[in-house]
Amino acid sequence: MNGALTVGTLDGANVEMHRVLGDENMFLFGLKTEEVAETRRNGYNPYRIYSRDPAIHAVLDQINKGFSDGVRYEDLHERLLFGNGGTPDEYMLLADFPSYCEAERRMVETYADRTKWNQMSLHNIARSGIFAADRSIADYAERIWKVPYKK
């Protein structure tokens, strides 16, 4: 990790990182596990979000138009809104977007405060030993792979 400050959702490896580093040393955003389940139960509809949120509408319209790089992004636009044979916005990106924008705002604000940014970075360096590759491999060898390893 080398002092990197994480911007991310509270899933996957970020759950363990959050447990070790705490809220104050990460920029978390997005729906929590129980909120994802509830949103799905209530009939998640990304097109409704697109229709009601001007910022998301503008972003997706720009994606649909492209970025003058010669690459066409209509498929991404269509998959997010309509699924194109799959689940629309399977990872609930549109639901997370406002929260992501807020996390980005907090990150930019924190970066402007060099002392605070450096304190957070140093904290993450000091607490990241548990995530070292050697420790992780030893843990996997013992708990998951059940193979001997040399200490």
Language-model features: locations:
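Catalytic binding pocket for nucleotide-activated donors in carbohydrate/polymer assembly enzymes
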Residues: 1-121, 125-130, 135, 139-151
